[in-house]
A protein has these predicted regions:
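Acidic, His- and aromatic-enriched active-site or binding-groove loops in soluble protein domains
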Residues: 120-146, 174-185, 222-229, 234
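Glycine-rich, N-terminal phosphate-binding loop and its surrounding beta-alpha-beta segment
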Residues: 12-90
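Accessory "access/gating" subregions that flank catalytic or transport cores
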Residues: 131-135, 139-153, 167-174, 185-201, ...
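Single conserved hydrophobic/aromatic residue that forms the stacking wall/gate
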Residues: 1-14
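Beta-rich nucleic-acid/ligand-interaction surfaces
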Residues: 107-108, 162-168, 203-216, 263-275
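Residues forming anionic-ligand binding surfaces in small-molecule and nucleic-acid pockets
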Residues: 45-73, 98-131, 147-173
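Catalytic-core signal marking the mid-to-C-terminal active-site face
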Residues: 183, 190-193, 197-198, 221-414
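A generic structural motif
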Residues: 68-74, 131, 171-177, 224-226, ...
Length: 414
């Protein structure tokens, strides 16, 4: 559970530093029953940050918080706690997990009442500039805001679809990166609103265009060195890197329910729109689920291409690391890399290559999640049970809906 907030006055700050901020956990879906509702927020003082878009007279700051039970133990339903647990396991093995996300989003117009739409008047595409890129000023304002908060922005540009943008920030340790993603999304939405726009992280807001992803670039360090690199290997990859890839491939289907959490997520994961479908890997080819970018040495990394920006970053990173560690611990063997463009192959051709595919719907993803006991163990019983219940409910509600497509296709004919 993430993406919630509570405000406190300045006179209350000292109490909150002593972890005395109580809230009603039963009022938030997925937390606890009403019989055990009292929960506490423990602020992480390292995450203190002034929000630059708020009035400078009477400034507003924020902390990321961990959730605890009244008896002083971490709440097992806190996704930040889940990530911390997996990071502790990695640390015991001598590893530091570094992550760099590629965050994509859309900037749409609002209607006369200020409500969001999925309308845009621009026709810009990949790497376009003004006057085609109508969102450039908003994107630049977002970047300047993030930089004032300590972000190191590595790149930003217009993406393939009209009104679609990407901003990449510097690699960092996983917990810091997950916190940064939460801050990033808040800043993007806030600054976009100032420009009269609505920022959407919905994976596929319109038919017929590319959806938005949140590719996860990751590496492991040990004793200050990137252990995914091995100059003696023909591809420059270490045995740990191959094992890590194998772990991701093994658990990719079960992870989909977390990495792609919405009904809409699976409208993005279709052939032809630069999103992965086939569970395989490549050194350069961008069509498989996993890609190894060309950089070697300290820059050697694995790019996991299925996650979308609707996903909880703490859980995504926890599962990516846990899957990779499973591969390393059990010395799983990665299949041969794929050089073909997987987007051009049929399902039958992919199956003939003994390559599996990602779930096609949220319902299939729920089934795969339920079958992957290792993934459930990583998340813990509380999150696994509550999350699966919520996603099953979401899927069943969607299946009962009558869409505009159905009305247009069937009403007149039948």
């Amino acid at each position: 559970i993430r993406d919630r907030s509570v405000s406190r006055g300045l006179g209350d700050v000292y109490k909150r530093q002593d972890n005395k901020c109580m809230f009603d956990g039963s009022s938030i879906e997925g937390f606890v029953r009403i019989e055990e509702s009292d929960m506490y927020l423990y602020p992480d003082l390292n995450t203190f940050e002034i929000l630059p878009w708020r009035p400078q007279h009477g400034k507003v700051a924020r902390f990321m918080c961990d959730v605890y039970r009244p008896e002083g133990v971490p709440f097992e339903g806190d996704s930040r706690y889940v990530l911390k647990n997996v990071l502790k396991k990695a640390a015991k093995m001598g590893y530091t997990f570094d992550v760099g996300p590629e965050c994509e989003f859309f900037l749409f117009h609002t209607d006369d009442n200020g409500q969001p739409t999925n309308i845009t008047h621009e026709k810009a595409s990949y790497f376009d500039v003004t006057p085609l890129d109508l969102g450039e000023n908003a994107r630049r304002d977002i970047i300047l805001t993030l930089e004032s908060m300590g972000f190191e922005i590595e790149a930003s540009h217009h993406e393939v679809a009209p009104a679609q943008h990407e901003i990449d920030f510097k690699y960092d340790e996983a917990l810091q990166t997950a916190d940064n993603i939460m801050t990033f999304k808040l800043a993007v939405k806030t600054i976009a609103k100032r420009h009269g726009l609505f920022a959407s992280f919905m994976p596929k807001p319109k038919y017929g265009i590319n959806g938005s992803g949140m590719h996860i670039n990751m590496s492991l360090e040990k004793d200050g060195k990137n252990i995914f690199f091995d100059k003696s290997n023909p591809m420059g990859l270490s045995k740990e890197c191959y094992h890590f890839i194998a772990g991701l491939i093994k658990h990719a289907k079960g992870m989909s329910c977390i990495c792609n959490p919405l009904v809409n997520s699976y409208k993005r994961l279709v052939p032809g729109y630069e999103a992965p479908v086939a569970i395989c890997w490549s050194s350069i080819n961008r069509s498989p689920l996993i890609r190894i970018p060309a950089s070697r040495g300290a820059g050697t990394r694995i790019e996991f291409r299925s996650p979308d920006p609707a996903a909880n970053p703490y859980l995504v990173m926890a599962l990516c690391l846990a899957a990779g560690l499973d591969g390393i611990e059990n010395e799983l063997e990665a299949p041969e890399p794929i050089g073909k463009n997987m987007y051009l192959l049929t399902e039958e051709q992919i199956a003939d290559m003994n390559i599996d595919v990602l779930p096609a719907t949220l319902g299939e993803a729920c089934d795969a999640f339920e079958e992957d006991k290792y993934i459930q163990e990583v998340l813990g019983e509380h999150i696994s049970k509550k999350y699966l219940e919520a996603k099953r409910k979401e899927w069943h509600e969607y299946c009962r809906q009558v869409s505009d497509w159905e009305t247009e296709a069937y009403l007149y004919k039948y």
